[in-house]
Structures are given as structure tokens and as C-alpha cells.
Curated annotation (Swiss-Prot):
EC number: 2.3.1.274
Main localization, broad class: cytoplasm
Organism superkingdom: Bacteria
DNA repair keyword on record: no
Catalytic reactions on record: a fatty acyl-[ACP] + phosphate = an acyl phosphate + holo-[ACP]
Function: Catalyzes the reversible formation of acyl-phosphate (acyl-PO(4)) from acyl-[acyl-carrier-protein] (acyl-ACP). This enzyme utilizes acyl-ACP as fatty acyl donor, but not acyl-CoA.
SUPFAM superfamilies: Isocitrate/Isopropylmalate dehydrogenase-like
Signal peptide (residue range): none
Name of the molecule in the record: Phosphate acyltransferase
Species this protein is from: Symbiobacterium thermophilum (strain DSM 24528 / JCM 14929 / IAM 14863 / T)
Pfam families: FA_synthesis (PF02504)
Compartments where located: Cytoplasm
Keyword Calcium on entry: no
PANTHER family registered for this protein in UniProt: FATTY ACID/PHOSPHOLIPID SYNTHESIS PROTEIN PLSX, PHOSPHATE ACYLTRANSFERASE
Length: 346
């Protein structure tokens, strides 16, 4: 059998239904992979029955606790040793699982990934990276929420990880890497962005094209967009909200009269294609890069399709040896200044 993926079945808003259904779909499509659903055994099996039962490559590990989004992440991870997240991280650390997926608390996932699984050597902070649709080909953006208040040297690490992901997963031979800012000029941005710009210019292994404004991201102005976790998350949520508002407005406009309804029927194939392109459930979750094993964060509002897509991201990361390739690339970075060698707190 192939890779073994641990799935937090109690993380989403509608848990465990989306996690169970999405995992079963993935298990049936990829019989060479193994899946472990962690959570309330009886609830998981009840949902599985609705989906036709558990395939042979899916097992259930019963847990008795749950980490909720309103809990302080570090305290919750340390006190709830029998929550799906903490048990899953333990399975990964002990080599009983190769990767972890959760639609639960982002903060708790970052903590459990950092403390439970561990950062890869040379990485100070992990970054959540996700695929975002554009009018051209998709763009990979990081960080979208794992590390707010990032330092310039951390953004350089994010850029390097994003470049590797774009090469190995998106298949781009020379990804265009850009830094999110409030202007394209080198002198634009806050202090961190201004300090990061020359560092990226000096990094020979990536194709840095300079700053990019948020409005240019949907038009495919770059292949990889690097940002601090705070503005990155704001851009991601704005992106999703505008897309949903646009499609809702379009639907109302096209169904407002018999004449527009006829036009909508004629345009339906094209509209469905466009809607699919901008549907976040098609792109799965965000990969938490910088850890010793693949970790994927799905939306709390994920449905079964989004969980399945997140598992597809995981499958690609495992088969593409993304973690190994990231470690190899990070090892090529210049050695840190001795005064910077202290391991930052989680």
C-alpha cells in the first residue's frame, strides 16, 4: 500500500459529514492510498453508512476530545491530547502516517504542526500556501494566515517554498515570483516589504519580478505571490467574497425576466465553466509549508468536494516529494548569522 493520510474528521463546521464523504470519495478513486479518519467513532461510521460504507483502505481511530476555533491554540493543543489534531500529529511524528488534513482551527493546526510534527531545518516559520484562480492560469499565494507579522527573512523563505511548489506541483519551469505590496515600485510598501524586496532580488534561484498590487493578482500578474500572513489572508477572503457576490449578482440579473432567463440558458455552459474556475472547493485546501511532513488546511465551511480536493493536493504533494525538494532547496540558502541561529518560539 502507498501513503497513509490522517484526516481530522471533527474540524469542519458540519463535521464529520464533509470529512467522511470526501475521504470516502478519495479512497475509492485512489485505492493505493490509505486514510485514517480521527474523531467520534459512532458519528464517523454513521456518516460512512450514508456514503455506502467505509472502503477497505479507510480506517477509523476514535478520539474523545475536540479542539474548537474559539480556544487559545497553544493551550488547547497542549491540554487536549486525545483530540483528532493532536493524535493525527502524533501519528505523523511516529511514522504511522505520512500527512495530515484538517478543516479545523488554523491556529491550532499551525501549533500542532510546529510542535507536534516540527519545522524542517532552515525554516523559521511555516506558511499557508493556496491556489487562487485567475483569468489565466492559477496563482500560488503564501502566506494566507499562518504567520502574521512576518520578518523579511521569513518572507524570503516563503518565496523559496512557493517557487518549489510552483515548479513541482503546477509544473512551471520558471515561476514568476512577486511580493504583495501597495504599489509596483521598489520603494512602495511597509518597512517589512521594503526590507524584503532587495533580499528577493539577491536570491539567484528564483525569478523575482518585483512587487505586485492586489488588483493585478486576479489577472495572472505572477505565478507565486508572497505576503505576510495578515494581508495575505485579507486578500484571500476578499477574493472569495467578491467572487461569491459577483456570481450571486449575475444570477439575479440573469433570472430577473423571461428574456434574461433565455439568455442565461444559452450562456449556461460558459457560466458553469467560469463558476467552476472560481469555486474554492475545486482547489482544495492550503498546504502548510515548512514542516517535516505535508499538512493541509481546508476551509471550516468545506463541503465533501472541498475535502476531496484538499486530499488531492495532499496526494500531489506526497507523490511530488515536495517536502524533500523543499528541504533540498532550503539547504542551499546562505547560512544564518550566528546571532540569528536561536530557534524562534512556536
Amino acid at each position: 500500500m502507498g501513503f497513509r493520510i490522517a484526516v481530522d474528521a471533527m474540524g469542519s463546521d458540519a463535521a464529520p459529514a464533509p470529512e467522511v464523504s470526501g475521504t470516502i470519495q478519495a479512497a475509492r478513486e485512489w485505492p493505493d492510498l490509505r486514510f485514517v479518519l480521527l474523531g467520534d467513532d459512532s458519528r464517523i461510521r454513521a456518516e460512512a453508512e450514508k456514503a455506502g460504507g467505509l472502503p477497505g483502505n479507510v480506517e477509523v481511530v476514535h478520539t474523545t476530545q475536540v479542539i474548537t476555533p474559539d480556544e487559545e491554540p497553544t493551550k488547547a493543543v497542549r491540554s487536549k491530547k486525545d483530540a483528532p489534531l493532536t493524535v493525527a500529529a502524533r501519528l505523523v511524528k511516529e511514522g504511522q502516517a505520512d500527512a495530515l488534513l484538517s478543516a479545523g482551527s488554523t491556529g491550532a493546526l499551525v501549533v500542532v504542526g510546529t510542535l507536534g510534527i516540527g519545522r524542517m531545518k532552515g525554516i523559521d516559520r511555516p506558511a499557508l500556501g493556496t491556489i487562487m484562480p485567475t483569468v489565466k492560469q492559477p496563482v500560488f499565494m503564501l502566506d494566507v494566515g499562518a504567520t502574521p507579522d512576518a520578518r523579511p527573512e521569513w518572507l524570503v523563505q516563503f518565496a523559496l517554498m512557493g517557487d518549489i511548489y510552483a515548479r513541482e506541483i503546477l509544473g512551471l519551469s520558471r515561476p514568476r515570483v512577486a511580493l504583495l505590496s501597495n504599489g509596483t515600485e521598489a520603494e512602495k510598501g511597509n518597512a517589512v516589504v521594503k526590507a524584503t524586496y532587495p533580499l528577493l532580488q539577491e536570491l539567484p534561484s528564483i525569478h523575482f519580478i518585483g512587487n505586485i498590487e492586489a488588483r493585478d493578482v486576479p489577472f495572472g500578474g505572477a505565478d507565486v505571490v508572497v505576503a505576510d500572513g495578515f494581508p495575505g489572508n485579507v486578500l484571500l477572503k476578499t477574493y472569495e467574497g467578491v467572487a461569491m457576490a459577483l456570481f450571486q449578482s449575475l444570477k439575479e440579473a440573469l433570472t430577473g425576466s423571461p428574456l434574461t432567463a433565455v439568455g442565461a440558458a444559452l450562456a449556461k455552459p460558459g457560466l458553469k465553466k467560469m463558476a467552476k474556475r472560481f469555486d474554492y472547493t475545486e482547489y482544495g485546501g492550503a498546504l502548510l509549508l515548512g514542516l517535516k511532513a505535508p499538512v493541509v488546511k481546508c476551509h471550516g465551511s468545506s463541503n465533501a468536494r472541498a475535502i476531496y480536493s484538499g486530499l488531492r493536493v495532499m496526494k500531489l504533494a506526497l507523490e511530488g516529494r515536495v517536502i524533500d525538494r523543499l528541504a533540498e532547496a532550503i539547504a542551499q540558502l546562505p547560512a544564518k548569522n550566528p546571532k540569528e541561529e536561536g530557534d524562534p518560539p512556536a
